[in-house]
Regions:
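Surface-exposed helix-capping loop/turn segments at secondary-structure junctions
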Residues: 131, 315-324
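Hydrophobic, well-ordered secondary-structure elements that form the walls
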Residues: 252, 310, 330
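Mg2+-dependent prenyl diphosphate-binding active-site environment of isoprenoid biosynthetic enzymes
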Residues: 25-265, 275, 335
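N-terminal amphipathic/basic leader segments beginning at the initiator methionine
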Residues: 1-25
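Double-stranded RNA-binding/processing signature
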Residues: 3, 82, 327
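Hydrophobic packing residues in well-ordered alpha-helices of helical domains and bundles
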Residues: 6, 10, 14, 68-71, ...
Length: 342
């Protein structure tokens, strides 16, 4: 794995996208509790996977950075809007080594900022028609529309499980949920959009679905693993937060399927409490159970298997393309998704 190339290109495309985001955020009132806050999460320095995947795929298929720029900006605006809303919904305390927006302000202001960023994401899409033409721009718009729909449906599934305190979930339920919540907006649509732009619409976008799904699932599972075992400073969020929030991760589902009836009853009782009433000692005990039943190791193995499947799909659809640093970047980012520490 070429870490140097991958990090350099993520940084390059991330900076380009961030610069574009700043140009689209209005410089007018009300600044203090809206427009200035819209710079906050993007400026904290995320990984930049989504714009990186979009731009690199576009270039690998013969397009240019300029062709993909507006779509990449939209993807990152929507991503940060989702993060603001997710932090409110999960009652999270930290994001990228800083207090979450609703902790810095309040929930009402954070929700409003997220709403405004979602709306702002439409503006770059409108600009696409001047570079890509109306027909292709409309196709890209529909891709974004489906991205938002799939993501919110997946989030609804997960929030509903927590509300109903579901303890009967299977791994198949989990994979259906992350397909919607994570895979479409993290990998499937960024790759599809990049390929559509790079080929000027002359490609079957559906052939990238398996690649994006395997990549997105590997990414999400690794993210869930890191929430339990990562260095908090590197990870940027509170370690073990997913247990406190009651998220139905692959590890929690594996644990519930393999633990004793007494331990399962303990889990059910723990998850029935409101988030702020859940005790750290109980969360630590659940983490110990996950280690005892090899739930974390099983999740790591699943993530590696999915990354291997993603690589096979990548070679199927990208091997015929000319050699380029963007093509190399896309191959390396699949490996990075399961080897990363943050």
């Amino acid at each position: 794995m070429n870490n140097t190339l991958m990090k350099e290109m993520l940084s390059r495309y991330g900076k380009l996208t961030l610069s574009g985001i700043h140009t689209f955020i209005p410089n007018k009132e009300p600044k203090e509790y809206l427009y200035d806050l819209m710079h906050d999460y993007p400026d904290r320095g995320g990984k930049g996977f989504r714009p990186g995947l979009c731009i690199a795929t576009c270039k690998a298929f013969g397009g240019s950075v300029k062709d993909a720029e507006f779509s990449a900006i939209t993807l990152e605006l929507l991503h940060n809007a989702f993060l603001i809303h997710d932090d409110v919904e999960d009652e999270s305390f930290n994001r990228r080594n800083k207090p979450t927006m609703h902790q810095l302000t309040n929930k009402a202001i954070a929700i409003n900022v997220g709403d405004a960023m979602n709306a702002l994401g439409l503006y770059p899409l409108f600009q696409n028609k001047y570079r890509l033409g109306e027909k292709l721009s409309e196709i890209i718009f529909l891709e974004i529309q489906n991205l938002v729909t799939e993501s919110t449906e997946g989030q609804a599934m997960e929030l509903g499980w927590r509300l109903e305190n579901r303890i009967d979930l299977t791994e198949a339920d989990y994979f259906r949920m992350i397909l919607k919540k994570t895979c479409w907006y993290t990998c499937m649509h960024p790759i599809r959009i990049g390929a559509l732009i790079g080929t000027k619409g002359y490609i079957d976008k559906k052939k990238f679905n398996r690649l994006g799904y395997f990549m997105g699932a590997a990414f999400q599972i690794q993210d869930d693993v890191l929430n339990l075992v990562a260095n908090e400073e590197e990870y940027g969020k509170e370690i073990g937060g997913d247990i406190l929030e009651g998220k139905r991760t692959l590890m929690l589902i594996h644990l519930m399927e393999n633990c004793t009836p007494k331990e399962k009853l303990f889990l059910q009782n723990y998850l029935s409490f409101p988030i702020l009433e859940r005790k750290q000692d109980a969360a630590k005990y659940i983490l110990e159970l996950m280690h005892r039943y090899n739930s974390i190791e099983e999740a790591k193995n699943t993530s590696k298997f999915l990354a291997g499947a993603a690589l096979k799909e990548f070679y199927t659809h990208f091997s015929q393309l000319p050699a380029s640093e963007d093509k190399d970047f896309l191959e390396n980012i699949i490996l990075y998704m399961i080897n990363r520490n943050y």
